[in-house]
């Protein structure tokens, strides 16, 4: 899980979702997991 100021899709399988007011990126590749913080 990377915590970043700006979250972006890294590959085609990445999805940007809003969960409880937090922007997250979920992907099949665990290295691509990100959270805005």
UniProtKB/Swiss-Prot annotation:
Keywords: Ribonucleoprotein, Ribosomal protein. One of its GO terms (biological process) is translation. The keyword Isomerase does not apply. GO terms for molecular function: structural constituent of ribosome. GO terms for cellular component: cytoplasm; ribonucleoprotein complex; ribosome. Belongs to the bacterial ribosomal protein bL36 family. HAMAP family: Ribosomal_bL36. This is Large ribosomal subunit protein bL36.
């Amino acid at each position: 899980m990377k915590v970043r100021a700006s979250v972006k899709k890294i590959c085609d399988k990445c999805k940007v979702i809003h969960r409880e007011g937090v922007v997250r990126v979920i992907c099949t590749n665990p290295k691509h997991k990100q959270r805005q913080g």
